[in-house]
Amino acid sequence: MIKVQTKWLERAQRIRAIAQAGLAFSKDVYDRERYEELMKLSAEMMADYSEKDIEVITDLWQGEKGYPTPKADVRGAVFRENQILLVREKHDELWSLPGGFCEIGLSPAENVVKEIKEESGYDTEPSRLLAVLDSHKHSHPPQPYHYYKIFIACSMTDGQGETGIETNHAAFFPEDRLPPLSPKRNTPSQLSMLFDFLRHPDKKTIFD
């Protein structure tokens, strides 16, 4: 059932992408009307196969203009004494790697340093790109957007554990005692991948 649900969500995202691109470039009034109808249809499909109301989805998509592309989500892998840094999100009390959407004007490396500082209080320095993964190819729950997830290894340089606007705890965990994870942000297999990089420093970058 999950695979069927995911496939329909991917189709809804694809229909929405085609419609949004059409609205960005088409001047024909009739074509634009058809693209608007496709946008509504894709929102209805998304609502049917996700946990979000159609109004929420419509609001999320309202400001999206131009040619659609996947969103970039960057996550920092910070280790200390063979334990990985995780932060707990306030709104669901689940744990994730520090990170978030890439902001315009900042590189992925600059973004991850900023996110780690804001969410955990630690100053870090990016050292290596570990992986670039497609959210559709991993066991994330259904979501309205398509993401490329960027994992960057970072070394701690200063600071102490502090919480941010979106987080209420930051702590280091060993691989065999991980807390409840936020599956839309990171999966158990992705955490295992990062610990594997720790054990094998010469491991090649992984990408989908």
UniProtKB/Swiss-Prot annotation:
GO MF term list = hydrolase activity; metal ion binding
Name any cofactors this protein relies on. Answer: Mg(2+); Mn(2+)
Q: Where does Mg(2+) bind?
A: 115, 119
Domain Nudix hydrolase as annotated: residue spans: 69-195
UniProt keyword Magnesium present: yes
Question: What SUPFAM superfamilies does UniProt report for this protein, alphabetically?
Answer: Nudix (SSF55811)
Q: Which family does it belong to?
A: Belongs to the Nudix hydrolase family.
Question: Could you tell me what this protein is called?
Answer: Putative ADP-ribose pyrophosphatase YjhB
